[in-house]
Structures are given as structure tokens and as C-alpha cells.
């Protein structure tokens, strides 16, 4: 696992994917065995009172959502179908283990740098209204789901 903590959205959010393209491409070049890339962050919704959660056991957990880029905007993105299939596989396992952990998958016309790797996706963890505790709780369940899915790939 490679955890990149670079702040690609500083100084301007509008160019964050241009900046992250260079960083992710460099990481993939330096780590040829990397097959899966997740862009994990909170959903930047202007309404900071919106905080999607689900109760798992006794915990309030931020709901997550896959955002999958495509070639719908005219940019080359040959592996978007593979990325979507992989997200569906993860989401199906999550629904089996922890119903409600994920909101429905969103398919977009932008690439979000997902053209760089098969199995690439955005995982939005809650929104700006969720607490850090709710988001960290989600990571615990996401790691269990990924562990089961990756054991079968």
C-alpha cells in the first residue's frame, strides 16, 4: 500500500486533478506492481449540514460512494468499464457485509485520472458535514471489504 498525502488541491481546487495526474503517474512508474489506485476523500458539498451516515452495530459510520470516470466527455479512457466492474464487485461485497455502507455508484463524463490504472476509482467518504470519527469508522469497514475482495482477485 502506498499512501500519498500530497495536498493536490492547494493552492487551487480547480487544478487538483492536473497536479495529481503527475503525482500518481510518477508513483505508478516507480511502483510497477501497483494495480489499484483509490482516490479517497470526503465529498465537497457546499451544504455542511449534509452528513450521510449508516449505523453499523453501535457506530455511526459515514456512507461512502464510488465515483467512476468514463470516456463520455470525449477523452481517451479505455479501461473505464474495468474500473466500473471492480467498483461494482467491491460494492456488492460491502452490501453483503454492511448494508447501506455505500450509496449508489456515480458514473461521470470526466476521467479523474482513472485512466492511469485498471481498478482506479474515487471513493468519497461522507461529506464535509460528517465528523472525522464517522469517516474513520468507515475506513475500518472499507478495509474489511477490500480484504475480502482482494483475496479473490
Residues of each region from the PLM?
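Second-shell loop/turn segments in exported
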Residues: 6-15, 24-27, 52, 72-81, ...
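A short, glycine/acidic-enriched catalytic loop
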Residues: 46-76
Amino acid at each position: 500500500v502506498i499512501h500519498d498525502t500530497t495536498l493536490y488541491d492547494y493552492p487551487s481546487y480547480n487544478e487538483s486533478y492536473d497536479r495529481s495526474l503527475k503525482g500518481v503517474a510518477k508513483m505508478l512508474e516507480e511502483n510497477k506492481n501497483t494495480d489499484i489506485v483509490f482516490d479517497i476523500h470526503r465529498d465537497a458539498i457546499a451544504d455542511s449540514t449534509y452528513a450521510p451516515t449508516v449505523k453499523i452495530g453501535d457506530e455511526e459510520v459515514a456512507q461512502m460512494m464510488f465515483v467512476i470516470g468514463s470516456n463520455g466527455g470525449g477523452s481517451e479512457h479505455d479501461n473505464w468499464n474495468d474500473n466500473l466492474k471492480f467498483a461494482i464487485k467491491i460494492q456488492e461485497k460491502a452490501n453483503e457485509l454492511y448494508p447501506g455502507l455505500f450509496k449508489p455508484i456515480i458514473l461521470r463524463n470526466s476521467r479523474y485520472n482513472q485512466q492511469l490504472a485498471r481498478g482506479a476509482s474515487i471513493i468519497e467518504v461522507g461529506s464535509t458535514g460528517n465528523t472525522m470519527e464517522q469517516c474513520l469508522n468507515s475506513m475500518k469497514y472499507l478495509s474489511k471489504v477490500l480484504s475480502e475482495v482482494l483475496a479473490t482477485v
